[in-house]
A protein has these predicted regions:
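Alpha-helical transmembrane segments and adjacent TM-loop junctions that form the membrane-embedded core
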Residues: 1-96
Length: 96
């Protein structure tokens, strides 16, 4: 069953999702980010993590890179090959 879910790019199990959600929430608090939308998919050892953060309009690219590096450092501790994509937007409709 879990192999079929992975092939269909379904959400991974709770034991995979929980540490990712915790890492995203920690980074969100640390950097004062707004709402976010998190998408996860798992295929074998590869874990695809996509996060969209809502940020203030004056947010700068240098800050975005710092957030990405910090989040990746946390996720690399997981027993998966993490493929991370982090997006930033000032439009709150993208954070839903």
């Amino acid at each position: 069953r879990s192999t079929l879910v992975e092939l269909l790019e379904g959400a991974p199990g709770e034991q995979v999702q929980q540490p990712v959600r915790s890492a995203v929430d920690d980074v969100k608090r640390q950097f004062g980010l707004g709402d976010h939308h998190l998408r996860l998919a798992k295929a074998g050892r590869k874990l695809y993590v996509e996060v969209d953060f809502v940020v203030p309009e004056d947010y700068v690219v240098r800050d975005e890179d710092t957030v990405r590096h910090n989040l990746l450092a946390r996720l690399e501790q997981l027993p998966h090959d993490v493929w991370l994509s982090v997006e930033f937007t000032a439009d709150p409709t993208w954070g839903d």
